[in-house]
């Protein structure tokens, strides 16, 4: 079988070593005679898996004991509702940094529970789109929290400077950003992330929340979205997606073996630079995003002639390069190169892009 590289935006590629281990253990995990999918989430065996996953994540991101780690369900969209239901307190107003598709989705959902201020930070200059720095955000004085999304997977744009507004609670949708680079957790009140991009398979959502922010859920909050209840029951108030939890734990161990987040960050920079260098040296491929806001995780580009799009995708697939079609919202191409994508995969795509341009440019 020829080698296939999967550039899907999510569910996304999982490290091959992790898949091999899961395959090896699938029918007889830890020599107990059955799959980990078949054992109770309250068994001592699975509780050990959960504890190790939490500790490995703490080690990777340097998360102090002043933060709770919750393993939940419902994805990022579930958190679009859960965040205001848990963090509003006596406030009615919130600040939502609108940088693209997903941050706008969070804003729309929040309108059901609070009065979100739409703070648009996307601008254009000399034909290039860019995002305002946190110091330029028009933050309210009386908002319960500030919500933002540091990486917009559809738009291919990122905010790399971490916000720091002293006593303001910062909430981050890190679904496509978590574990890709070093961050200062202490800057945030809450971080949430769907697993299916940089963590593991879909089905589990990870929340990092400052402990002093737990316990203020509104009365309308469903129990499974109430952070206090989730915390009280150690993320097992209802039956969790045990296989997703287990596989996420394997990914955490894999990341540690790679040298941790510092090494991963360096590799991610190298991978994205390969593709952006080809785009910048070409009139065939187009990316209209300012260099300071280009996503390292999701490299978006258009062909100079959109009539070549289907041919590009067809020939790319024949070359073992899958899932490069851009989101329907903006079209074009998108190469999602999360942590699991090896450098060799990006090099193969770069080589193909040069070939395709030479043939059809």
Swiss-Prot record:
The modification N6-(pyridoxal phosphate)lysine is found at residue 197. The keyword Transferase applies. The keyword Cytoplasm applies. It is an enzyme of class 2 (transferase). Its cofactor is pyridoxal 5'-phosphate. InterPro entries: Aminotrans_V_dom, Aminotrans_V_PyrdxlP_BS, Pser_aminoTfrase, PyrdxlP-dep_Trfase, PyrdxlP-dep_Trfase_major, PyrdxlP-dep_Trfase_small. Pyridoxal 5'-phosphate binds at residues 76-77, 102, 153, 173, 196, 238-239. One of its GO terms (cellular component) is cytoplasm. It is found in: Cytoplasm. It holds the Pfam family Aminotran_5. Binds 1 pyridoxal phosphate per subunit. It catalyses: O-phospho-L-serine + 2-oxoglutarate = 3-phosphooxypyruvate + L-glutamate; 4-(phosphooxy)-L-threonine + 2-oxoglutarate = (R)-3-hydroxy-2-oxo-4-phosphooxybutanoate + L-glutamate. Pathway: Amino-acid biosynthesis; L-serine biosynthesis; L-serine from 3-phospho-D-glycerate: step 2/3; Cofactor biosynthesis; pyridoxine 5'-phosphate biosynthesis; pyridoxine 5'-phosphate from D-erythrose 4-phosphate: step 3/5. Its EC number is 2.6.1.52. GO terms for molecular function: O-phospho-L-serine:2-oxoglutarate aminotransferase activity; pyridoxal phosphate binding. Keywords: Amino-acid biosynthesis, Aminotransferase, Cytoplasm, Pyridoxal phosphate, Pyridoxine biosynthesis, Serine biosynthesis, Transferase. Belongs to the class-V pyridoxal-phosphate-dependent aminotransferase family. SerC subfamily. Catalyzes the reversible conversion of 3-phosphohydroxypyruvate to phosphoserine and of 3-hydroxy-2-oxo-4-phosphonooxybutanoate to phosphohydroxythreonine. HAMAP family: SerC_aminotrans_5. This is Phosphoserine aminotransferase. The lineage of its organism: Bacteria, Pseudomonadati, Pseudomonadota, Gammaproteobacteria, Enterobacterales.
């Amino acid at each position: 079988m020829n080698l296939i590289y999967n550039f899907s935006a999510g569910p996304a590629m999982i490290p091959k070593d992790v898949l091999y281990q899961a395959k090896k253990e699938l029918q007889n995990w830890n020599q107990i005679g059955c799959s980990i999918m078949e054992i109770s989430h309250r068994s001592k065996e699975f509780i050990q898996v959960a504890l190790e996953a939490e500790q490995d994540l703490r080690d990777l991101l340097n998360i102090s004991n002043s933060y709770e780690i919750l393993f939940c369900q419902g994805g990022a969209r579930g958190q679009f509702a859960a965040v205001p239901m848990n963090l509003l307190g006596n406030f009615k107003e919130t600040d939502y940094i609108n940088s693209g598709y997903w941050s706008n989705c969070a804003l729309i959902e929040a309108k059901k529970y609070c009065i979100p201020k739409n703070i648009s930070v996307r601008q254009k200059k000399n034909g290039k789109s860019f995002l305002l720095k946190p110091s330029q955000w028009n933050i309210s004085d009386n908002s319960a929290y500030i919500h933002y999304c540091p990486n917009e997977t559809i738009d291919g744009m990122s905010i790399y400077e971490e916000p720091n507004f002293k006593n303001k609670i910062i909430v981050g949708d890190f679904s496509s950003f978590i574990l890709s680079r070093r961050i200062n957790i202490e800057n945030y009140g809450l971080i949430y992330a769907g697993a299916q991009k940089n963590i593991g398979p879909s089905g589990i959502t990870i929340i990092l929340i400052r402990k002093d922010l737990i316990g203020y859920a509104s009365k309308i909050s469903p129990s499974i979205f109430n952070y206090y209840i989730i915390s009280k029951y150690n993320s097992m108030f209802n039956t969790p997606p045990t296989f997703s939890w287990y596989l996420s734990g394997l990914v955490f161990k894999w990341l540690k073996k790679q040298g941790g987040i510092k090494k991963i960050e360096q590799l991610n920079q190298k991978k994205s630079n390969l593709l952006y260098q080809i785009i910048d040296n070409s009139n065939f491929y187009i990316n209209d995003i300012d260099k300071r806001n280009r996503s390292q995780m999701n490299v978006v580009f258009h062909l100079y002639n959109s009539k070549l799009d289907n041919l590009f995708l067809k020939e790319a697939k024949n070359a073992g390069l899958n899932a490069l079609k851009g989101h329907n919202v903006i079209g074009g191409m998108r190469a999602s190169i999360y942590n699991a994508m090896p450098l060799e995969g990006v090099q193969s795509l770069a080589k193909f892009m040069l070939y395709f341009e030479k043939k059809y440019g």
